[in-house]
């Protein structure tokens, strides 16, 4: 085994304690009781597979490694000299908030393995946590380090979105405060809305100007709208709220009722808000290329039981499992990314919570509302025009629209539209899994 000789770079610097080396300067100053910083001479070396290079002195003022990087990911990979990577694409940067949470714990390893962006797409993961979750975030980074994913070229962790979101091309915003006992929906809108307003500003300041944003933290539709309103330099079409888990649940229920495998179910739309006002659309859905209503000839089941099963699935899962749906949510995030980077099959579509301006359905503008989309696989999408509406569908689409308009009024102070007025509809419409 070759051993590299380490020679000093003769660049003296102040080194903070290693367990705090990824914190922003502001947060370092705010923490009390820190071990005293020490002054050392920097040692540097460069490693590449099957090759040990002679250490080279770093010129004065040069930065050898980013202070936010983690462990083995701090070393420079020489992609030009790695035979297996010559056909790889240019590395993309993915930022994830709530990265120490259970959803992210399932998602990050899917991203790192290549099943999301492809077997020739190297990625950098930038993980955002909080002061409270920072040690857990270090643990996540350690597990990624130990997993030896060849496509995972960089991992960095931090608690400042203005640092973590830098150059991000995808932002998966999962972090949000859960709804606690006695908390009203208006309270949750305000608390999480402030988080997403700040993250929107951070994206605007430091992310790629064409960053694609998927909001998962609830209430995700209005959180996505708030996030959209705060970065004026990012196209509104780039913001999505997660609907895919609801779509997957709807496909599952239709497949079970029809006695077929779920891959036979297509053209499923979830209209509206991610709440109990959501509208699983069986009018346009198909099974084996045939309209659902011609396969499942049970109108009452479709209008009542099917819709309730989809809406309440998360609550039933909690009763059985004792926890919310983290793994299936992570899968649904992957499923939400896939149709944006893969051309939509002819005749099919996928739902996503997107900006309503210019929509062909008559839905109020300036909302994030789940609607049917098609994509050419370039990260962009267009709304589907050839959909059928009946009175049942229109009435329920309108109800969900009114709820989102009320949520928008309740968060006007976070979107720059004036004083908030909370006149949310009576009754609790939050999905059971959000509580």
Curated annotation (Swiss-Prot):
Cellular component, GO annotation: chloroplast
CDD domains the UniProt entry points to: MDH_chloroplast-like (cd01338)
Enzyme Commission identifier(s): 1.1.1.82
InterPro entries from the UniProt entry: Lactate/malate_DH_C, Lactate/malate_DH_N, Lactate_DH/Glyco_Ohase_4_C, Malate_DH_AS, Malate_DH_NADP-dep_pln, Malate_DH_type2, NAD(P)-bd_dom_sf
Disulfide links within the chain: 69-74, 410-422
Stored Pfam families: Ldh_1_C, Ldh_1_N
Record flagged with keyword Disulfide bond: yes
Alphabetized UniProt keyword annotations: Chloroplast, Disulfide bond, NADP, Oxidoreductase, Plastid, Transit peptide
Chief localization: plastid
Residues given in the record as NAD(+) binding sites: 199
Quaternary organization: Homodimer.
Function: The chloroplastic, NADP-dependent form is essential for the photosynthesis C4 cycle, which allows plants to circumvent the problem of photorespiration. In C4 plants, NADP-MDH activity acts to convert oxaloacetate to malate in chloroplasts of mesophyll cells for transport to the bundle sheath cells.
Domain remark in the UniProt entry: Removal of amino acids 57 to 76 results in the formation of active monomers, a shift of the pH optimum from 8 to 7, the loss of oxaloacetate inhibition and an increased maximal velocity.
Name of the protein this chain belongs to: Malate dehydrogenase [NADP], chloroplastic
Organism: Spinacia oleracea (Spinach)
Lineage: Eukaryota, Viridiplantae, Streptophyta, Embryophyta, Tracheophyta
Record gene name: MDH
